Amino acid sequence: MLDQAVAYLCCPHCRGNLLLDGRSLRCRAGHSFDVARQGYASLLGGDARTGTADTAAMVAAREAFLGRGHYARIRAAVADACAAVGPDPRGCVLDVGAGTGYHLAEALDRLPEMKGVALDVTRHALRRAARAHPRMAAVGGDAWRMLPLRDGVVSVALNVFAPRDGDELARVLAPGGALVLVTPTGRHLAEAIAALDLLTVDDRKRERLEGKLGGRFDHAGERSI
């Protein structure tokens, strides 16, 4: 699927356009990125925070959890929001922090004319995302750094329980594009938090989120699940 998505990608070192040359992505400046045999390409820059990447066991556990339908309502709501934006085949659907491509695959089913890019820092997740949907490309990238996508090529950006850089999301979104953002409430994973004495969701999370995204995006609506 990388052959269909390369038109949206750029070099993480020089921001030059990329071309698919056999089993590599290359820019005119000579930077080259191998395509793994599993079908994904890593476009992580030199300053990427790979130390935060999930292990193979963590990815397998998450895939099993999602496969049991625990997030099915969230997945459907994300797909509904994408469908409401409407298809724009000139741009792609980007999922920042896509993991295995669980949410993006459903969104692409609802937008049959569009292609998707699953961006994640974890190679174990990218291996699964590369085969999650025939119109999904899996690309290694750090949500906290420059996104390896060209300016204004994203029609819909997804960000589901994942980190984000508001400036970068605004840069890659096309005029009239939409950001579909999913954040936890205080009830998120409440049973696990209580049983394992984990950190709770910050009461000021919404305020901090609006502070980071304010001025770049107009609020179009929200839904609680």
What residue ranges belong to the model's regions?
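N-terminal auxiliary segments of SAM/dcSAM-dependent transferases
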Residues: M1-T52
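Class I SAM-dependent methyltransferase Rossmann-like catalytic core
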Residues: G51-A77
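Glycine-rich helix-loop-beta junction characteristic of Rossmann-like nucleotide cofactor-binding loops
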Residues: D80-D88, L147-P148
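Class I SAM-dependent methyltransferase SAM/SAH-binding core
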Residues: C92-D95, T100-M146
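A short acidic, Gly/Pro-enriched loop at the edge of an enzyme's catalytic core
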Residues: R145-V156
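A short SAM/SAH-binding and catalytic strip from SAM-dependent methyltransferases
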Residues: V154-E168, T183
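A short glycine-rich, Lys/Arg-flanked "PGG" loop and its adjoining helix->strand segment in the class I
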Residues: G166-V180
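Substrate-binding/catalytic lobe of Class I Rossmann-like enzymes that use SAM or dcSAM, i.e.
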Residues: A194-I225
